[in-house]
A protein has these predicted regions:
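Basic, polyanion-interacting recognition surfaces, primarily
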Residues: 1-82
Length: 82
């Protein structure tokens, strides 16, 4: 079974839940940003374009993570209604 790492407030946990299952359990402010990452949207400071035409999510702590094109288009649609 696949192991998932969870980073929270500087601590790392390993759990055996699949991301798909976590996505259904976690509150709606946890969003998928790529195939292997769920992120708390409240901790994302901004999205930035990168040299290859892609997008990175920049977190308040300074960490950066690649955002897939598919996920970014879903994130944009989510905020277009606001």
């Amino acid at each position: 079974k696949k192991v998932t790492a969870v980073d929270t407030k500087g601590k790392r946990y390993r759990i055996q839940e699949r991301l798909r299952d976590l996505e259904n359990i976690l509150p709606s402010y946890f969003i998928r940003i790529n195939k292997s990452t769920l992120a708390n949207e409240h901790r994302i400071e901004r999205f930035v374009a990168v040299f290859n035409g892609g997008v990175d999510a920049v977190f308040r702590c300074g960490y950066r993570e690649y955002v897939s094109r598919r996920c970014f288009s879903q994130i944009r649609r989510r905020y277009e209604g606001i």
